[in-house]
Regions:
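Conserved N-terminal phosphate-binding loop of PLP-dependent enzymes in the Aspartate aminotransferase
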Residues: 1-234
Length: 234
């Protein structure tokens, strides 16, 4: 086919594929969401960016889920010391209002094409997106995501020491994965129906946590308490 899938952080595999000279573009999610909160390392990302540059391949960062402050920086790739050619954005850009965008490096010369766009530049969507940026700045939500993410991850790792069902805690900012030695459904159903706490999931054993960027310490503590109650009952 025309698409090749390669393992995250296996730089040698990516370099081998890129050095064939027929790769148009590379798309990576710097923190994989549905992929299980797997994180690209700086060494991998920088090596990949260099390989793309060497081979004339476009580097695309998918920031739809991990961008817009979610990781504790505005974009997740900023943790990795790279500058992609294209950045895809959605979800957080409109805080629930349907909108998406594509950020393009100034290295690409803009030209007029034949096609237009049906919903592009929608005034209501753009107004919502501008309001989101205002609130993020006024309420320091990116910094709050970093601080509260650090706190939540630390508390979850502390909980791991007394809860053998937790096998791993990983993530950055408010994009966190908690892995169990039991199916995530065993934990998630109790959280939803008994503790009234909604979470995401990935794979078969991972609880995926993406709380609002405005989460408070009290709310984080409340979640830890509810999760502890559920785990104690397993």
């Amino acid at each position: 086919g025309h698409v090749t899938y390669l393992p995250l952080n296996d730089l040698a595999a990516w370099e081998e594929e890129l050095d064939k000279g027929d790769v148009c573009a590379v798309i990576i999610e710097c923190i994989q969401g549905v992929g299980g909160i797997q994180m690209a390392t700086p060494e991998f990302a920088q090596g990949l960016a260099a390989a793309c540059k060497r081979n004339g391949t476009i580097l695309v960062c998918d920031e739809i889920q991990c961008g817009y402050g979610r990781s504790g920086k505005f974009f997740a790739h900023q943790w990795l010391g790279i500058k992609p050619d294209l950045i895809t954005v959605a979800k957080g850009i409109g805080n629930g209002f349907p909108m998406s965008g594509l950020l393009i490096s100034p290295d690409f010369k803009p030209v007029y094409g034949q096609l237009g766009t049906t919903f592009g530049g929608n005034h209501l969507a753009c107004t919502a997106a501008l309001a989101v940026l205002d609130v993020m700045e006024q309420e320091n939500l990116v910094e709050n995501a970093r601080q509260m993410g650090d706190y939540l991850i630390a508390e979850l790792k502390k909980l791991q020491q007394s809860q053998p069902h937790i096998t791993d805690v990983r993530g950055r900012g408010l994009m966190i994965g908690v892995e169990f030695d039991v199916p995530h459904a065993d934990v998630r159903k109790k959280l939803v129906y008994e503790q009234h706490c909604f979470t995401g999931c990935a794979g078969t054993n991972l609880l995926r946590l993406l709380p609002p960027l405005c989460i408070t310490k009290a709310e984080a503590d409340d979640f830890i308490s509810r999760l502890t109650t559920v785990l104690n009952a397993l």
